[in-house]
Amino acid sequence: MKFFLFFVILLAMEPVISGKHHILRCMGNTGICRPSCRKTEQPYLYCLNYQSCCLQSYMRISISGREEKDDWSQQNRWPKIS
């Protein structure tokens, strides 16, 4: 019975992976800090650890800091349902 209880507890525990580190986010949690970006990502500026801030290729960055009235704005992102 003790062996069965030990076995159940062992299976229920989350496995510990050595070398697993926290993913650093950038650009308001829309990007990920990596040494090199993937094929579907574009590098944008740098993170605090001197790695590239990788954003998805479909992301658009507004330099002015305010949302512009184009097809990518929040109001025009989805069609309106009447």
From Swiss-Prot:
One BP annotation, GO: defense response to Gram-negative bacterium
Signal peptide span: 1-19
Residue spans crossing the bilayer: none
InterPro entries linked to this entry: Defensin_big_dom (IPR028060)
Subcellular location: Secreted
Top-level taxonomic group: Eukaryota
UniProt GO cellular component terms: extracellular region
Disulfide topology: 26-53, 33-47, 37-54
Keyword terms, alphabetized: Antibiotic, Antimicrobial, Defensin, Disulfide bond, Secreted, Signal
Family stated for the protein in its record: Belongs to the beta-defensin family.
Role noted for this protein: Has antibacterial activity.
Protein name as annotated: Beta-defensin 119
Organism encoding this protein: Canis lupus familiaris (Dog)
